[in-house]
Amino acid sequence: MDVAAPETAQNLLAQCGHFSIRMAETPQEIRLAQQLRHRVFGGELHHLPDGNGLDQDEFDGQFRHLLVREERSGKTVGTYRIQSGADAGDGRGFYSESEYRIAGLEKIRRELWEVGRSCVDPEFRSGAVIALLWAGIAALQKKEAFRYLMGCVSIPGSLTREAWQFYRYLKRHGGVSDLLCGVARSGFECPDRESLPQEDLLPQEVMTPLLKGYLRAGAKIAGEPVLDRAFGTVDFLILLDFGAMTDRYRRHFTGDK
């Protein structure tokens, strides 16, 4: 699916068919992201924040918010938030550090950006919307020239045994980062660590589209699985090194020829 660079509008990052991705510039636009997150997380993850119809936290103010819009209706159908290492240093830190103690961060902080709160309207989970979320990140990476992308990727909270099996499989097969090492903070420990099958198999249940996309792009798992009880998810810390990305996926990710 072809994603085109925009011709106009400074905050417009890319276009694909009748969808576009842009950077939120106003509090009202950020509310659109928070409303979508509330609706999707509340409906699918049974995570219901306070009753104002918004999913918001203390980190939202320091993040930049990507919005995918369906142009015919004007509806916001996808969102992702992203912050630089400098943003994190000036604010409350990295969101991922609320779940993990992460060794190695300071060595790469200046080259590191963090993403999170990926969310797509269930009626619009097409290739176009997902491609535009990737294109938005790629446009920022090209502009800001950061090397590393870090974030938490979620799978259903019932898959604790499968999460540990997945982590063990990647560790045996070179899929775990040697740059960062995340360990669960108190209250985020993932159970079932010891009750693992002996087979060296990759459990397909954990391979959500987002996680699969990161792994295909060359990302590595940067920490053991954690259990986010508030959201009812198991989370993996991922680290994507743009400097180590293959030419094929660099072209796919950035749109470069």
Please place each PLM-identified region on the residue numbering.
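Short, cationic low-complexity segments
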Residues: 256-257
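Short amphipathic alpha-helix that is part of the acyltransferase structural core
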Residues: 9-77, 81-84
